[in-house]
Amino acid sequence: MVTPCPASPGSPAAGAGRRDSHQNLRAPVKKSRRPCLRRKKPLRPLNACSLPGDSGVCDLFESPSSSSDGADSPAVSAARDCSSLLNPAQPLTALDLQTFREYGQSCYDFRKAQENLFHPRESLARQPQVTAESRCKLLSWLLQVHRQFGLSFESLCLTVNTLDRFLLTTPVAADCFQLLGVTCLLIACKQVEVHPPRLKQLLALCGGAFSRQQLCNLECIVLHKLHFSLGAPTINFFLEHFTQWRMEAGQAEVTEALEAQTLARGVAELSLTDYAFTTYTPSLMAICCLALADGLLQHQHEMDLRLGEHPEATLQDCLGKLQTLVSINSSSLPRILPPQIWERCSLPQSWQ
């Protein structure tokens, strides 16, 4: 580094020298690399719904396994303005079909082998305070929350699976059941959603009955009880697999296959609230929902029930219960299905 020549302090040259030296010797200042924090967007307001009950839990759908006379529950009409339509299945791209050709069968075999490991049977056997009716009410409320946030069907399936598997391990008090449902929804959304709901939003849905610390503590308990084993095969996975298989094998037109998948998702959504359907595996439920959807849409090429290699008696038993479920909720289905799908449905007179 070159040092300027010294000058007397009182001379003008000294002052000029100081100014020049300061200008010449000034080192470039590096700007601090602080992270550029974006301004947080305000919480998206949720549409308020006047639902019965102080906890926000309501029964949106009727269950064949519960005591009902086949009429819609009062909460169905109360939540009519709060429910959004089920998004129709998106058209498959050439990349999706190519990926299915290369990895579809391998993924199916892997998921099918894991099915029994993640399938909770008789989840309420050890629950003295949680009943099938309270489970139906909680999941009906969670369905409404799921639509309100615009979450994927995969996250809903994982929520129900996490809930039932935890109920197998730990008795739950009735006053903590809603907190458990919200916790399972949060765990599921963290797995598959790009933008999961915030804790503040989920706690607000519970009417301020629970704290942030309670939710975080219960989340840790659920994860430890399940040994952090969360990647369960879902109905959504098998619905997508069988739909792609039908199109690849030429057993259904693309439009018909996607319409059947959308309707099958709506039927499967209803079945998640009914404890009677927990005895069936997700792959069997997917096949039966697609077969029922083909029948309601009057498709020429119906779903091959032998595809999943399930017993014929079990398939027919599941189909019969699904028909009963759809007949009971025939007035509720139009509010959870896209209009263009529901208009094409043809329900038998005996179901209406």
From Swiss-Prot:
Residues 28-40 have a biased composition (Basic residues). SUPFAM superfamilies: Cyclin-like. One of its GO terms (cellular component) is cytoplasm. Keywords: Cell cycle, Cell division, Cilium biogenesis/degradation, Cyclin, Cytoplasm, Nucleus, Phosphoprotein. One of its GO terms (biological process) is multi-ciliated epithelial cell differentiation. It is found in: Cytoplasm; Nucleus, Nucleolus. Present in respiratory cells (at protein level). Expressed in multiciliated tissue in brain and fallopian tube (at protein level). Highly expressed in oocytes. Belongs to the cyclin family. This is Cyclin-O. It comes from Mus musculus. The gene is Ccno.
